[in-house]
UniProtKB/Swiss-Prot annotation:
UniProt cofactor note: Binds 2 Mg(2+) ions per monomer.
Matching NCBIfam families: PRK11779.1 (NF008746)
EC number(s) per entry: 3.1.11.1
Pfam families with a match to the protein in the record: Exonuc_X-T_C, RNase_T
Annotated site, Important for interaction with ssb, chain positions: R149
Name of the molecule in the record: Exodeoxyribonuclease I
Enzyme class per UniProt: hydrolase
Summary of the function given for this chain in its UniProt record: Degrades single-stranded DNA (ssDNA) in a highly processive manner. Also functions as a DNA deoxyribophosphodiesterase that releases deoxyribose-phosphate moieties following the cleavage of DNA at an apurinic/apyrimidinic (AP) site by either an AP endonuclease or AP lyase.
Keyword Nuclease: yes
Limits of the ExoI SH3-like domain: 203-351
A GO MF label: 5'-deoxyribose-5-phosphate lyase activity
C-alpha cells in the first residue's frame, strides 16, 4: 500500500467529517476520516479515522444521529475530547505538499476544521497553505464537468430532470462502490473513486482546474482593466442554469482583497443601471445588488473560473450561451462606469454588521496579532496539568473566554472551584428547561415518525437516555460544588 513520494511532489489528502449537526461553528464533529494518495490516486497509507465526543454544554441534533448512525455514547467509548481529536487531525493535515480535498469541503468540512482548531488553540488557517499545502473541492469540479464537459459520466437527475450532485447518487449511477453513505471512511473512498473517474474521462478539464485552484493562478485568468469576461461555475446560479454563468470582473472588494466583485452577464444589466441611477446609495442594500446581478467570487475558496474560450461551438445551445449579447452588456457597463464605485461603496456595508457575543461564533471577527499567536502556540504545547499555572496577557478580548471554554470542555478537572461553578452554570443556562423541553419534544416527534423503523427507534431511544444522563451529570456536578 505504501508508495514513496518524490521530494516536493503533490499528494492528495481526501477527508470527510460526520457531525452532530450542520452548523459549522456551533455544532460538533463526531467522526473524521482521511486517506492519503499520490497524484494518480494510488493509496499511500492506511485510512485515519477518529471519533470525538461532545462537551457538557452541547447536545447533538437528533436528525444528525439518524443520518450518520453515530451516537454520542459511541463517541464517548471510542473517541477523544475535542482537543485531542483536533490535534490528531492537525498532525495529519500539516504533512508537506498536501492538497486537502473533499466533497463540499470548502463550504462544510474545511469550516469544521477551522472552527475546531480555533476553539482548541491551533492555527485555524495554516494547515491549508503552510508547507506548500493547498485545498480543493471535488464537488465544484463535478459541477464544472457537468456544465462544460459532461460526456463520459452518468449524471443522476431528479423528478424535474435537473442534475443531482449528491455523492451517493453519483456513485450509484456510475457503479462506484459506496457501501455505507454517511460513514466518513466510506465517503472518502467514494470521493477518491469519483475523482479517478473524472480524471480518466475528462483529463484536460481535471488538470486545468487543479492547476487553477490557488489565488495566484486564478488571478492570471482575471483582467479587470480590459473588461474581459470569464466563465464561473457555482451552485449560486442554480441547476436550471447548469450552475454556470459568464461574468464580468469589475473590481476587488475594498475591505477584502480575496473578493472579486463581478456582474452576472446573464442578468438584465439595464435594470441594474436604472436602479442605481434612481435610488439613493443610502437606500441600496447588498441584497438589491445581488438580485440585480452583482456576484462576489471568493478567490480563497477555490472557485471554478475559466476563460470564455472554454465554451465550444457545440456547447452554446446546450448552455444557452449568448456571447454576442454578453459583449453588448459589457459595452453598457463601460458606458456606465459609475456603477463600479457605487457597488464597491454599497458592499462596504456588509462589514458593518454587529459581531456575535458568543465567542464560538467570532472566528472571522479578525486575525490574531503576532503577540497572541505566540501565546496560542504556547498553550497548544502545554500539558493539560500545567494550563492552570499559565499567566497569559491576551491582547484580543476573545482569547480569555476561549481559553476558559477550552479548559472547561477538555480538562474540567484542572479548573479551580470558582471556574467549575462558572462552567456548570453556563452549561445549565445553555441546556435550560425551555431548550430541553423542545429538544425532547423533537426526539419524541421523530420516534412517532419512525415508529416502523427499529434501527432509528433504537438510535433515538439511546439519544433520549443520553440526554437524561448528561443533564443528571451536569446537575450533580452543580450540587457537589454548591
Amino acid at each position: 500500500m505504501k508508495n514513496i513520494l518524490k521530494k516536493n511532489e503533490v499528494n492528495f489528502l481526501f477527508y470527510d467529517y460526520e457531525t452532530f449537526g450542520i452548523h459549522t461553528s456551533l455544532d460538533k464533529p463526531a467522526q473524521f476520516s482521511s486517506i492519503r494518495t499520490d497524484k494518480n490516486f494510488n493509496i499511500m497509507e492506511e485510512p485515519k479515522c477518529f471519533y470525538c465526543f461532545p462537551s457538557d454544554d452541547y447536545l447533538p441534533d437528533p436528525s444528525s444521529i439518524l443520518i450518520t448512525g453515530i451516537t454520542p455514547e459511541y463517541t464517548e467509548k471510542h473517541g477523544f475530547n475535542e482537543y485531542k481529536f483536533s490535534k490528531k487531525i492537525h498532525d495529519v493535515l500539516l504533512k508537506p505538499n498536501t492538497c486537502i480535498i473533499g466533497y463540499n469541503n470548502i463550504n462544510f468540512d474545511d469550516e469544521i476544521t477551522r472552527n475546531i482548531f480555533y476553539r482548541n488553540f491551533l492555527d485555524p488557517y495554516e494547515w491549508s497553505w503552510k508547507n506548500n499545502n493547498s485545498r480543493w473541492d471535488l464537488l465544484n469540479v463535478v459541477r464544472a464537468c457537468y456544465a462544460l464537459r459532461p460526456s463520459g459520466i452518468q449524471w443522476p437527475k431528479n423528478e424535474f430532470g435537473l442534475p443531482v450532485f449528491k455523492l451517493s447518487d453519483l456513485t450509484q449511477k456510475n457503479n462506484i462502490s459506496h457501501y455505507n453513505a454517511h460513514d466518513a471512511t466510506s465517503d472518502v473512498y467514494a470521493t477518491i473513486e469519483l475523482a479517478k473517474l473524472i480524471k480518466r474521462k475528462q483529463p484536460k478539464l481535471f488538470d486545468f482546474f487543479f492547476k487553477y485552484r490557488k489565488k495566484n493562478e486564478l488571478c492570471r485568468l482575471i483582467d479587470i482593466e480590459k473588461f474581459t469576461p470569464i466563465i464561473y461555475v457555482s451552485s449560486y446560479f442554480g441547476a436550471l442554469r447548469q450552475n454556470m454563468s459568464c461574468i464580468l470582473p469589475l473590481s476587488w472588494d475594498l475591505h477584502n482583497k480575496n473578493i472579486l466583485i463581478s456582474i452576472d452577464l446573464f442578468k438584465d444589466i439595464d435594470k441594474l443601471i436604472v436602479f442605481c441611477k434612481t435610488v439613493s446609495i443610502s437606500n441600496i442594500s447588498i441584497k438589491d445588488l445581488f438580485d440585480l446581478g452583482i456576484v462576489l467570487v471568493y478567490l480563497n475558496r477555490c472557485p471554478i473560473l475559466a476563460p470564455i474560450k472554454v465554451i465550444r461551438k457545440e456547447d452554446t445551445n446546450r448552455l444557452n450561451f449568448k456571447k454576442y449579447f454578453y459583449y453588448k452588456k459589457i459595452n453598457l457597463v463601460k458606458k456606465n462606469y459609475f456603477l463600479i464605485d457605487l457597488v464597491k461603496n454599497v458592499l462596504l456595508k456588509k462589514n458593518e454588521n454587529k459581531n456575535s457575543l458568543n465567542v464560538d461564533l467570532q472566528i472571522y471577527d479578525s486575525f490574531f496579532n503576532f503577540h497572541d499567536k505566540n501565546l496560542i502556540k504556547k498553550i497548544s504545547l502545554t500539558k493539560s496539568s500545567d494550563l492552570k499555572k499559565m499567566k497569559l496577557d491576551f491582547k484580543d478580548p476573545r482569547l480569555k473566554e476561549l481559553f476558559f471554554r477550552y479548559k472547561a470542555r477538555n480538562f474540567f478537572n484542572i479548573l479551580k472551584n470558582d471556574e467549575k461553578k462558572e462552567w456548570i452554570n453556563y452549561c445549565l443556562k445553555t441546556l435550560n428547561s425551555f431548550f430541553l423541553t423542545g429538544y425532547i419534544d423533537k426526539i419524541e416527534s421523530l420516534l412517532k415518525i419512525y415508529s416502523y423503523d427499529v434501527k432509528k427507534n433504537n438510535l433515538l431511544s439511546d439519544l433520549l437516555k443520553y440526554v437524561f444522563k448528561k443533564y443528571k451529570k451536569v446537575f450533580y456536578k452543580n450540587i457537589n460544588l454548591s
